[in-house]
């Protein structure tokens, strides 16, 4: 089966402390790798100002993950858990060209 490269960008609430943010990022990195993702690259883009308010916040901490997977299981599980977690304001997943 062909492997697909994915890029997941998500925004964390700006008022979360540094230790909690690191734990959140580590937890979601683990969720993705536990569900079959390989070659995980996880980067912090830092705090950025929004063009409009999201849930009464004017800024947020951006984080991006890039990984390869044989199926959509890591993406589906990340999406499910990120919608439940109230520390994540938004997320977006993109399928990248090879």
Curated annotation (Swiss-Prot):
Q: Function, please?
A: Binds together with bS18 to 16S ribosomal RNA.
Question: What is the protein's name according to its record?
Answer: Small ribosomal subunit protein bS6
Family matches, as CDD domains: bS6
User: What organism does the UniProt record list as the source?
Assistant: Lactobacillus johnsonii (strain CNCM I-12250 / La1 / NCC 533)
The entry lists its GO molecular-function terms as: small ribosomal subunit rRNA binding; structural constituent of ribosome
Keywords, A to Z? Ribonucleoprotein, Ribosomal protein, RNA-binding, rRNA-binding
Name the residues that span the membrane. Answer: none
User: Key word Ligase present in the record?
Assistant: no
Query: What family is reported?
Result: Belongs to the bacterial ribosomal protein bS6 family.
Q: Name one GO cellular component term.
A: ribosome
A GO BP annotation:
translation
């Amino acid at each position: 089966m062909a492997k697909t490269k994915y890029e997941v960008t998500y925004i964390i609430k700006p008022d979360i402390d540094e230790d909690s943010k690191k734990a959140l990022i580590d937890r979601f990195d683990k969720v993705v790798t536990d569900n079959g993702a390989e070659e995980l690259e996880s980067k912090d883009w830092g705090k950025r100002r929004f063009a409009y308010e999201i849930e009464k916040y004017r800024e947020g901490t951006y984080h991006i993950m890039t990984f390869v997977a044989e199926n959509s299981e890591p993406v589906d599980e990340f999406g499910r858990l990120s919608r439940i977690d109230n520390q994540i304001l938004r997320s977006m997943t993109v399928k990248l060209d090879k």
